[in-house]
Amino acid sequence: MLILTRKVGESIVINDDIKVTILGVKGMQVRIGIDAPKDVQVHREEIFKRIQAGSPAPEKHEDTH
């Protein structure tokens, strides 16, 4: 696992087309923004595990774009 340190407003880039930006930190929560192509699925881990287990994905909301 690669471990990086970023400040609010800073980003990392993955594969030239995915950008992850730190939007804010409040206590133990970190808000991140993810810019990715439409064909790249982005899910929270607990949603991804549900999808893998065959459960239906929840309705479209903040997890998808």
Curated annotation (Swiss-Prot):
The keyword Repeat does not apply. It is found in: Cytoplasm. GO terms for cellular component: cytosol. InterPro entries: CsrA, CsrA_sf. GO terms for molecular function: mRNA 5'-UTR binding. Keywords: Activator, Cytoplasm, Repressor, RNA-binding, Translation regulation. GO terms for biological process: mRNA catabolic process; negative regulation of translational initiation; positive regulation of translational initiation; regulation of carbohydrate metabolic process. Homodimer; the beta-strands of each monomer intercalate to form a hydrophobic core, while the alpha-helices form wings that extend away from the core. Belongs to the CsrA/RsmA family. A key translational regulator that binds mRNA to regulate translation initiation and/or mRNA stability. Mediates global changes in gene expression, shifting from rapid growth to stress survival by linking envelope stress, the stringent response and the catabolite repression systems. Usually binds in the 5'-UTR; binding at or near the Shine-Dalgarno sequence prevents ribosome-binding, repressing translation, binding elsewhere in the 5'-UTR can activate translation and/or stabilize the mRNA. Its function is antagonized by small RNA(s). This is Translational regulator CsrA. It comes from Pseudomonas putida (strain ATCC 47054 / DSM 6125 / CFBP 8728 / NCIMB 11950 / KT2440). The gene is csrA.
